[in-house]
Structure formats: structure tokens, C-alpha cells
Amino acid sequence: MFNNHLHLTPFIHIDDFQQIRINGPFELTVLSPHSCQLSGNGYILIIESENTLISSMNVEEVIINVQELKRLELRKMEIV
């Protein structure tokens, strides 16, 4: 039997370090006008720049525009 449900593969696409596109299940937290954090699938992505702007967001994807990227960190969540 063929199952035609769409299963999105999480990915991070970085375009010239000015636009970051993230796909997959995640939770977005805006920490300040300069930084945001995405968490999901056991990982945390931290983005810091001079200006961090959420330009587009829907259930499956977020597009973040940054100016003068200062920090882009992907780390595994600590499971306690």
C-alpha cells in the first residue's frame, strides 16, 4: 500500500549569510531585535546579528533575514 503523506525533511539553507531558511518542526523564540532561537528535533539553532528580522513564517518554514551575522550556532539539546 502506498502512503502519500508528505514528510518534510528538516533543513537549513543559508544564502550569502543574509537570509536563513529553516524547514521542519521547530519552536521559534525571538530573544531580542538582534537574536532568535529555534528548537526542535533535539537541536537548538541560535542566530545573532546586527538586525535579525523574521521575514516569513508558516507551519513548515521560517525565513530569517540578517544583517552582519555575528553568531550562527547549532547544538544538540541536553536531555535530563
What are these regions (language model features)?
Residues 2-80:
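N-terminal intrinsically disordered, cationic/polar leader segments
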